[in-house]
Every structure is written in C-alpha cells, then in structure tokens.
Design a protein with these regions (language model features):
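Class I SAM-dependent methyltransferase SAM/SAH-binding core
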Residues: 5-56
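Conserved class I S-adenosyl-L-methionine
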Residues: 95-147
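A short acidic, Gly/Pro-enriched loop at the edge of an enzyme's catalytic core
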Residues: 56-67
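Short alpha-helix
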Residues: 171-190
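Long, charge-rich, low-complexity alpha-helical segments
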Residues: 204-228, 234-235, 278-323
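Short, glycine-/aromatic-enriched active-site segment of Class I SAM-dependent methyltransferases
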Residues: 109-115, 148-169
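A short glycine-rich, Lys/Arg-flanked "PGG" loop and its adjoining helix->strand segment in the class I
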Residues: 80-92
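A short SAM/SAH-binding and catalytic strip from SAM-dependent methyltransferases
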Residues: 65-79, 102
Length: 323
C-alpha cells in the first residue's frame, strides 16, 4: 500500500473489485487513507481495506487475482520468503506485479551507501546531515556527485526519499540472472516486463547490430540491453502461477473478434497520451477505427479494418481484443 498511490489507481481501474492494501507503516497508511478518501477510490470498488500488516502476515487472505508489490521485497532480510508469501496467495490464474532494484544502474548509490557506512553516519538525522554534506563536499567533477545531481537530486529533495535511497539499512538488488533465480525459488513464471519498451534492443541499436540482437532469444536480448544501458536502476515485471501463453490470432479470428479501446489512454475524443503518459501518434485511419470501436463495441473488427491495422494497434496496446 505505501502512501496509497497504486491502491488509488487500482481501485479506479478495477471497478467492483475487492481491494486490500497493507503496509507496516502507520504513517504511510494515514497518507494512503486520506489519498483514497479524497479521490473517492472506495466508491469505485466493492470493498477497500487498508491495514497495518506485514506481507509476511497474510494468513486467511486471498487468493488474489492481482497482487501489486512495489519497492518492498528488496528491503526484506529474506526477500525469497516474502516472494513465497505472495505466491501462496495468488489465484491459479492470477498475476503478481513486482518492482525490484537492478544492481548495475545503482552503482553510484551502492558506493555512496558504503561510504556513509564506513563513516559511521548511521540511519537517522545524523546520517541524513552527513549524507547531504557529502555531496556538497565532493569535488564538482566527482562521478558520484555528478550522478547524484543528474539522476537523483530531484527525487531526493525530501529527506524521507534521501534516507530511503542512501541510508536504508536493508537492501538487495539484482541482475537478470539473479532475478530469474529469485523467481524460481517461489515456483512462479515470468510473464513479461511492465515496461517492455525499456528492454527492446531497438531502443539502443539499429542496422546490422539490431538485426543480430533481434535474432537472439528474448532472455538474451534482455541481457544485451542490461549490458548496454547501465542506467537501468530497477526491474518491473509480471509473474504468474501458471505459464502465460501469448494468444495467436489468425486473420480469420481477428475478423470475428470485437474490440475494446485501451481504457488507460488519455485524451478526448481522441487519445494523445498512452497508458504510460507517453505521446502517441495516430493516423487518420487509426483514429477513425478507435472511434468506431468505442461507438460500436459489438461490431466485429473484420467489418471495420484490415488484419494488419488491427494487429498494429494491438501491438501498440491501443486496442484490446475480445472473442
């Protein structure tokens, strides 16, 4: 639950659901409750509970169709125990979304943490004072100071965020190999990144290099991206209790399917921002198709567009398919 950001939007995006948010911090829960009260989140769902509990203490809860755990497991003394606790409460067809620290993109954070530890800075107000003084004292050209200014200074303006980044007493970060080994400890299956564009080699390569990259199996493509982009500081991804098979739609099946415009797009009457608030470009034909699908939800797609146009919008996550 934390301060309720994800609890809030999950309520609004899943009307009629039963929602449980847990956190060990009473202060964070107070913020979460006020946030959800102001937004009217509880009115969107069948039930909303926000409780001061550990994710290790969820006996009698579940099974859940969807579990969202962001920035929690990597702060546990035994992250694998926390993962198994969540896995035990996942419905057979459910999804678990995790956010975990990535090792390579946090090198400057790890060095700063180690330096402050060697200086016996502590984790309280003294550590906060010394940590901020450290960045003010380091020479301007120092890589740690430069990376802090360029990447983290804005996020760390609040003292709580600075302490969470540089003074947290318990933290684990992962590379891809360790990440998949971690997933296997709970018997779960990797179901994809929630930010797949970050792991697309086309973001970094072109020409022959991109062709060679795209010929690799998916996991090796991701390993390549991990090596080429040292600024990736976290993993965000979905896990499932059972393997998820990607649906393969023939031209005939596409023609018989009905469509649903992605409900997380922004802009009326035509979307201008995607589900991640990224600008999207639509041709006149695409704009017309999305409008028609919204106005005629029971119309089969074959009567409205070609299979190639439908597939393109589906691949861009602008159009969802219904049998």
């Amino acid at each position: 639950c934390g301060t309720g950001v994800s609890t809030d939007y999950l309520c609004h995006l899943n009307p009629g659901a039963d929602v449980l948010g847990v956190d060990i911090s009473d202060g964070a829960l107070a913020v979460a409750r006020e946030r959800c009260q102001r937004s009217g989140a509880a009115k969107q769902v069948s039930s909303l509970r926000q409780e001061q509990r550990s994710l290790l203490d969820l006996e009698g809860e579940g099974p859940f169709d969807y579990i969202n755990s962001v920035g929690v497991l990597h702060h546990l003394d035994q992250p694998e125990v926390g993962l198994r606790s969540l896995a035990d409460r996942l419905a057979p067809s459910g999804l678990l979304h995790l956010f975990l620290y990535a090792d390579a993109g946090r090198w400057e954070i790890h060095r700063t943490q180690k330096a402050l530890s060697l200086l016996n800075a502590g984790t309280g107000s003294e550590g906060l004072r010394l940590g901020r003084e450290l960045f003010e004292t380091l020479p301007e050209g120092n890589r740690l100071a430069r990376h802090h200014r360029e990447r983290w200074a804005v996020d760390c303006a609040p003292d709580a965020n600075f302490a969470d980044m540089y003074l947290h007493p318990q933290e684990t970060s992962y590379n891809l190999g360790c990440l998949f080994a971690f997933i296997e400890t709970a018997g779960l299956h990797f179901a994809g990144f929630s930010n797949p564009e970050v792991w697309d080699p086309a973001r970094l390569l072109k020409g022959e290099l991109l062709e060679r990259a795209q010929a690799l199996p998916p996991r090796q493509q991701w390993e390549l991206v991990e090596q080429l982009d040292p600024d990736i500081s976290h993993f965000e991804f979905f896990l499932s209790a059972a393997p998820v098979e990607r649906a393969r739609w023939s031209d005939e099946a596409l023609g018989l399917a009905r469509g649903l415009v992605q409900p997380c797009l922004w802009g009326e009457p035509d979307p201008i921002l995607g589900s991640n608030m990224e600008p999207i470009q639509l041709s006149d034909a695409d704009r017309s198709l999305l409008r028609t699908v919204a106005e005629q939800p029971e119309q089969t797609l074959g009567a409205l567009a070609s299979p190639n146009q439908i597939r393109d919008l589906v691949d861009r996550q602008l159009l969802l398919l219904k049998e």
